[in-house]
Amino acid sequence: MLQYQIDRIEHQVADDRAQTGVFLIGPLERGQATTLGNSLRRVLMGGLEGSAITAVRIAGVNHEYATIPGVREDVLDILLNCKQLSVNSRTSELEIGRLVVTGPAQVKAKDLQFSSQVQVVDGDRQIATVHEGHSLELEVHVERGIGYRPVDRHNEDISAIDLLQIDAVFMPVRRVNFTIDETAVAEGGSTRERLRIEIVTDGSTTPDDALAESANQLIELFQPLATVTMVEEPGLEPEPSAESQIPLEELNLSVRAYNCLKRAQVNSVSDLMGFSYEDLLEIKNFGSKSADEVIEALERIGISIPQSRTST
């Protein structure tokens, strides 16, 4: 199996704490870089668990189209600003952050007070502007999840009239790009490939951790395929042999034996295979001579039946 290595050739942290990592993976066989790049990108963009603000409560506000006295931004603007906050919750439980700010003040993400389980990634991100003589009291709910969860899919438990729910974007990876380069020709003349993948996160996780987590998810997905076992579905019977499908007429039995079997609803060899020699003798007007005749006819096509019902 071809051995390859992974090198991180670039790592940047932006002003909003977003992180960018660039990795080189190779050498790979032709076609493997595309397979690897597409698989990693799919998991990175939609399969990683992340944290997001899912609801906001503002004192004195019970709908998203309201305005707040003494606050420059309207409620919709504040909800959008909260939606864009990057947070990292280390628990699967609902976490609540609160702030009370008296103007004049620029209300920022760092003003939110959370438990030790939640980290605000970009504390300088603006939430609202409060004028002198006014105040803003705000509460945000933080949850963990995967992918994108629109408002209409929220649990009905969170249905308080003053709790403004927002679309939750749990994806910690903002962007993934990859390119494929050809590397040196290997022995035998085959060209190798190298995957260059760029991962941009919101800062709640590092590109290194995001890449490792996506790889682990792919391993878990494919691992069961390495030990595939065939399980016969219940109720399925094996395909009948060609001999068992031979009609009774083709056994060339005597008229007496043939008529007795037909009256007993025996129409083919497969029907006869359910009989033992003793069963044949119990058919009305069917003697040992007729039974022996049937046994011989079956043996000519390679089929035998037991002498008694208990024979194996």
Swiss-Prot record:
Record's keyword annotation contains DNA damage: no
Please give the Gene Ontology molecular function terms for this protein: DNA binding; DNA-directed RNA polymerase activity; protein dimerization activity
Instruction: From the UniProt record, give one GO term of the biological process aspect.
Output: DNA-templated transcription
EC class (word): transferase
Q: Which Pfam families does the protein's record reference?
A: RNA_pol_A_bac, RNA_pol_A_CTD, RNA_pol_L
E.C. number, please?
Answer: 2.7.7.6
Q: Quote the InterPro entries the UniProt record gives.
A: DNA-dir_RNA_pol_insert, DNA-dir_RNA_pol_RpoA/D/Rpb3, DNA-dir_RpoA, RBP11-like, RNAP_asu_C, RNApol_insert_sf
**UniProt keyword annotation of Transcription present:** yes
Entry's Gene3D superfamilies?
5' to 3' exonuclease, C-terminal subdomain (1.10.150.20), DNA-directed RNA polymerase, insert domain (2.170.120.12), RNA polymerase, RBP11-like subunit (3.30.1360.10)
Q: Where is this region: Alpha N-terminal domain (alpha-NTD)?
A: 1-229
GO cellular component terms listed in the entry, alphabetical order: cytoplasm; DNA-directed RNA polymerase complex
Give me the reactions it catalyses.
RNA(n) + a ribonucleoside 5'-triphosphate = RNA(n+1) + diphosphate
User: Domain remarks in the entry?
Assistant: The N-terminal domain is essential for RNAP assembly and basal transcription, whereas the C-terminal domain is involved in interaction with transcriptional regulators and with upstream promoter elements.
Protein family according to the UniProt entry: Belongs to the RNA polymerase alpha chain family.
Record's subunit section: In cyanobacteria the RNAP catalytic core is composed of 2 alpha, 1 beta, 1 beta', 1 gamma and 1 omega subunit. When a sigma factor is associated with the core the holoenzyme is formed, which can initiate transcription.
Could you tell me what this protein is called?
A: DNA-directed RNA polymerase subunit alpha
Query: Lineage of the native species?
Result: Bacteria, Bacillati, Cyanobacteriota, Cyanophyceae, Synechococcales
